């Protein structure tokens, strides 16, 4: 459980309750902490420790944490002859029109660029080490249990769910029926990670549903599941250049990973409702 080296870490011990493996806590920016792993041998390394908040604009911190530390982990995987699955991001696409396709990237913030740089570094290592499995997964809009500790960066699903449980109308940007995202449930994301272990070839792959749904859809489905009819409160979108439409091209994910999403937005939210209710008003933070 390696933190990302700054105060934007979203890890929490409660997400580890019930885990029976060895737990070593460290900072991926610290080479001495990485050395703590030397006594272990790994078949696969899942690298999900990094800055994941797109609103962090300190370029030096982001590049050191996301890219420099990734280089250390690639060297570690090479030494251990371990296959590596790591988290890339749909932020590498910026505001390119849908469907977003691997090989067509235009990052528009330091976070997106750091993930793009990681993908380039992974490709270089793949060419130089053809027997080493290295797969990057570009996650789109993930939602589901165990994200609560991300606070304000948690998914729209849990944030709107708690607004509704507070007895309030969900608050959305004006025109939210036309703001589209590729929302994918965490269970599908976990499956994608597992299937990446047996990828036909190294590379970077999109992890989304291939279908875009609106912010308004989220609010409407939640109200249906929670048996409420509060309507929706709209406010002006304060962000200029706001991304209006993300939708993953998952053709290569199907071909090379065998990954196809199984859970629709309606099914995912329905499954998530008990957790949303349990956490409502909780001091679990």
Model-inferred region functions:
Residues 110, 123-180, 186-191, 197, ...:
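NAD(P)-dependent short-chain dehydrogenase/reductase
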Residues 7-13, 96-99, 147-151, 218-220, ...:
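Short aromatic-enriched loop/helix-cap "lid" or pocket-rim segments at secondary-structure transitions
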């Amino acid at each position: 459980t390696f933190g990302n080296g700054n105060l934007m870490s979203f890890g929490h011990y409660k997400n580890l309750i019930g885990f029976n493996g060895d737990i070593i806590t460290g900072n991926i920016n610290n080479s001495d902490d990485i050395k703590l792993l030397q006594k272990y041998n790994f078949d696969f390394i899942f690298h999900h420790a990094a800055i994941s908040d797109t609103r962090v604009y300190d370029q030096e911190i982001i590049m050191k944490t996301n890219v420099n530390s990734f280089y250390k982990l690639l060297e570690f995987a090479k030494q251990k002859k371990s296959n590596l699955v790591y988290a890339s991001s749909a932020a590498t696409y910026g505001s390119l029109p849908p469907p977003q396709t691997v090989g067509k990237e235009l990052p528009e913030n330091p976070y997106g660029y750091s993930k793009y740089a990681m993908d380039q570094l992974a490709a270089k290592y793949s060419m130089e080490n053809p027997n080493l499995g290295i797969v990057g997964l570009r996650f789109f809009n993930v939602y589901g249990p165990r994200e609560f500790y991300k606070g304000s960066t948690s998914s729209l699903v849990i944030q709107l769910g708690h607004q509704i449980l507070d007895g309030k109308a969900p608050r959305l940007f004006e025109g939210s029926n036309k703001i589209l995202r590729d929302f994918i449930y965490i269970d599908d994301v976990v499956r994608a990670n597992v299937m990446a272990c047996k990828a036909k070839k190294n590379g970077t792959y999109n992890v989304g549903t291939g279908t875009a749904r609106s912010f308004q859809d989220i609010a409407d489905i939640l109200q249906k599941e929670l048996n409420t009819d509060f309507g929706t409160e709209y406010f002006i979108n304060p962000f200029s250049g706001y991304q209006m439409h993300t939708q993953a091209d998952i053709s290569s994910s199907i071909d090379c990973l065998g990954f196809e999403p199984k859970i629709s937005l309606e099914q995912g939210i329905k499954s998530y409702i008990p957790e949303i209710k349990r956490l409502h008003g909780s001091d679990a933070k």
